[in-house]
């Protein structure tokens, strides 16, 4: 009887073990299906929030597999980026994501804009180099018509044989505008050209509130203008995040024209010894938003930055500096940078070598070169105000 009883107990234990193994296999299968679903977002009409939820579920189950070719996803979010690859038990390497964002709107019947996009994307992708575990995530903010233009261009410039992994994510401009408006409404009257003009739309303040719009799974992102030409591997620009001092939330280059010498004229008249609007290296010439490194995690955690978004603070600073601009987010960052420069990591001019010389011919020829000077090997050319970019 003792032998029979022991045999029955052993049989029951083996049955339970088999059930547990079946349950474990089912969980692994579910996780794999979730990951596959993420990589095929482009075939459906995913929303921003649903894609993020799907991503979280996939990451909870297993590491994402290597995609066979660049993906064209709609409103999706990618895994969090980090400075180094992380290894799970068993030696599995977790992908490291790098996020770039560009505005691509009103492009369908705009040949000059399409030409700029071609120059920017072709030079960016031709020089980009990433490790096997790294993924470049290209985010585009656009409406339906421009989205199709971008897809056609990317299919040409991103062949399946690209030397690195790349995902493309589209964000609907109308959806983001609705989310942005409550945050930036108060500041638009100080930094917009007027009703119905290009910068009067709240979407052009996206960088100001990006930390509230993007999911927390994206801790860092670089926002780029389309009138750029890249002369080096964009991967190197992400290393600038490591140079941020404590308290800094945004990396941005100086404005290379006396734009803000002009804008701050009244404050400068009332404060003749101020550095506001003066050229570098001693002065504060303001910022140019063509290339911006946004540490979204730091922006979310900064009490100072959060306070500066409040309408009362915006009005207080605008009144103090007699500030009325027309360049959207660039104006906002310039104004708060005069008051709180510790919020900003200043990029070298070679990361945003601006070429526009408009102010040289409009009253500031005597001081122009002090702002425009930039020494060193250019990494990114910026053909602002439709200035031609040098050929290779």
Curated annotation (Swiss-Prot):
<comment type="subunit">
    <text>Homodimer. Dimer formation may be essential for the retention in endoplasmic reticulum.</text>
</comment>
<feature type="disulfide bond">
    <location>
        <begin position="349"/>
        <end position="374"/>
    </location>
</feature>
<keyword id="KW-0464">Manganese</keyword>
<dbReference type="Pfam" id="PF01501">
    <property type="entry name" value="Glyco_transf_8"/>
</dbReference>
<dbReference type="InterPro" id="IPR029044">
    <property type="entry name" value="Nucleotide-diphossugar_trans"/>
</dbReference>
<dbReference type="GO" id="GO:0140560">
    <property type="term" value="F:xylosyl alpha-1,3-xylosyltransferase activity"/>
</dbReference>
<keyword id="KW-0472">Membrane</keyword>
<feature type="binding site">
    <location>
        <position position="330"/>
    </location>
    <ligand>
        <name>a glycoprotein</name>
    </ligand>
</feature>
<feature type="binding site">
    <location>
        <position position="227"/>
    </location>
    <ligand>
        <name>Mn(2+)</name>
    </ligand>
</feature>
<dbReference type="GO" id="GO:0030145">
    <property type="term" value="F:manganese ion binding"/>
</dbReference>
<dbReference type="GO" id="GO:0035252">
    <property type="term" value="F:UDP-xylosyltransferase activity"/>
</dbReference>
<feature type="disulfide bond">
    <location>
        <begin position="356"/>
        <end position="385"/>
    </location>
</feature>
<dbReference type="InterPro" id="IPR002495">
    <property type="entry name" value="Glyco_trans_8"/>
</dbReference>
<dbReference type="InterPro" id="IPR042465">
    <property type="entry name" value="XXLT1"/>
</dbReference>
<keyword id="KW-0256">Endoplasmic reticulum</keyword>
<keyword id="KW-1015">Disulfide bond</keyword>
<dbReference type="GO" id="GO:0016266">
    <property type="term" value="P:O-glycan processing"/>
</dbReference>
<protein>
    <recommendedName>
        <fullName>Xyloside xylosyltransferase 1</fullName>
        <ecNumber>2.4.2.62</ecNumber>
    </recommendedName>
</protein>
<keyword id="KW-1133">Transmembrane helix</keyword>
<keyword id="KW-0735">Signal-anchor</keyword>
<feature type="topological domain" description="Cytoplasmic">
    <location>
        <begin position="1"/>
        <end position="19"/>
    </location>
</feature>
<feature type="binding site">
    <location>
        <position position="327"/>
    </location>
    <ligand>
        <name>UDP-alpha-D-xylose</name>
    </ligand>
</feature>
<feature type="binding site">
    <location>
        <position position="382"/>
    </location>
    <ligand>
        <name>Mn(2+)</name>
    </ligand>
</feature>
<dbReference type="GO" id="GO:0005789">
    <property type="term" value="C:endoplasmic reticulum membrane"/>
</dbReference>
<keyword id="KW-0479">Metal-binding</keyword>
<feature type="region of interest" description="Interaction with target proteins">
    <location>
        <begin position="262"/>
        <end position="265"/>
    </location>
</feature>
<keyword id="KW-0812">Transmembrane</keyword>
<feature type="topological domain" description="Lumenal">
    <location>
        <begin position="43"/>
        <end position="392"/>
    </location>
</feature>
<feature type="binding site">
    <location>
        <position position="359"/>
    </location>
    <ligand>
        <name>a glycoprotein</name>
    </ligand>
</feature>
<keyword id="KW-0808">Transferase</keyword>
<feature type="binding site">
    <location>
        <position position="289"/>
    </location>
    <ligand>
        <name>UDP-alpha-D-xylose</name>
    </ligand>
</feature>
<feature type="binding site">
    <location>
        <position position="330"/>
    </location>
    <ligand>
        <name>UDP-alpha-D-xylose</name>
    </ligand>
</feature>
<feature type="binding site">
    <location>
        <position position="384"/>
    </location>
    <ligand>
        <name>a glycoprotein</name>
    </ligand>
</feature>
<feature type="binding site">
    <location>
        <position position="225"/>
    </location>
    <ligand>
        <name>Mn(2+)</name>
    </ligand>
</feature>
<feature type="binding site">
    <location>
        <position position="226"/>
    </location>
    <ligand>
        <name>UDP-alpha-D-xylose</name>
    </ligand>
</feature>
<keyword id="KW-0328">Glycosyltransferase</keyword>
<keyword id="KW-0460">Magnesium</keyword>
<feature type="binding site">
    <location>
        <begin position="103"/>
        <end position="105"/>
    </location>
    <ligand>
        <name>UDP-alpha-D-xylose</name>
    </ligand>
</feature>
<feature type="transmembrane region" description="Helical; Signal-anchor for type II membrane protein">
    <location>
        <begin position="20"/>
        <end position="42"/>
    </location>
</feature>
<dbReference type="GO" id="GO:0000287">
    <property type="term" value="F:magnesium ion binding"/>
</dbReference>
<comment type="function">
    <text>Alpha-1,3-xylosyltransferase, which elongates the O-linked xylose-glucose disaccharide attached to EGF-like repeats in the extracellular domain of target proteins by catalyzing the addition of the second xylose. Known targets include Notch proteins and coagulation factors, such as F9.</text>
</comment>
<comment type="similarity">
    <text>Belongs to the glycosyltransferase 8 family.</text>
</comment>
């Amino acid at each position: 009887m003792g032998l029979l009883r022991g045999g029955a107990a052993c049989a029951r234990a083996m049955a339970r073990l088999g059930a547990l193994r079946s349950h474990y296999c089912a969980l692994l299968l579910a996780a794999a299906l979730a990951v596959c679903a993420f990589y095929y977002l482009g075939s459906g009409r995913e929303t921003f929030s649903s894609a993020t939820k799907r991503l979280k579920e996939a990451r909870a189950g297993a590491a994402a597999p290597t995609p066979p070719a660049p993906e064209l996803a709609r409103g999706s979010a990618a895994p969090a980026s980090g400075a180094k690859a992380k290894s799970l038990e068993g030696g599995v390497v977790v992908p490291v994501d790098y996020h770039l964002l560009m505005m691509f709107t009103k492009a369908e019947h705009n040949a000059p804009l399409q030409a700029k996009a071609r120059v920017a994307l072709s030079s960016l992708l031709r020089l980009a180099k990433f490790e096997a575990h790294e993924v470049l995530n290209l985010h585009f903010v656009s409406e339906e018509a421009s989205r199709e233009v971008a897809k056609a261009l990317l299919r040409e410039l991103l062949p399946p044989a690209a030397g690195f992994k790349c995902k493309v994510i589209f964000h609907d401009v109308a959806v983001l505008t609705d989310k942005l408006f409550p945050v930036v409404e108060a500041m638009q009257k100080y930094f917009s050209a007027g009703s119905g003009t290009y910068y009067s739309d709240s979407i052009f303040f996206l960088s100001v509130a990006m930390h509230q719009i993007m999911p927390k799974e994206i801790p860092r992102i670089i926002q780029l203008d389309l009138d750029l030409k890249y002369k080096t591997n964009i991967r190197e620009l992400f290393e600038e995040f490591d140079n941020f001092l404590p308290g800094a939330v945004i990396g941005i280059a100086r404005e290379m024209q006396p734009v803000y010498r002009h804008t701050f004229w009244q404050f400068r008249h009332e404060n003749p010894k101020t550095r506001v609007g003066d050229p570098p290296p001693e002065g504060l010439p303001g910022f140019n938003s063509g290339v911006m490194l946004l540490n979204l995690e730091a922006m979310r955690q900064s009490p100072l930055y959060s306070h500066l978004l409040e309408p009362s603070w915006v009005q207080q600073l605008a009144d103090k500096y007699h500030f009325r601009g027309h360049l959207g987010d660039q104006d906002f960052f310039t104004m708060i940078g005069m008051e709180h420069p510790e919020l900003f990591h200043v990029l070298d001019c070679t990361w945003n070598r601006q070429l526009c010389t408009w102010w040289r011919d409009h009253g500031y020829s005597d001081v122009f070169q002090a702002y425009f000077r930039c020494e060193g090997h250019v990494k990114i050319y910026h053909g602002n105000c439709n200035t031609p970019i040098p050929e290779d």
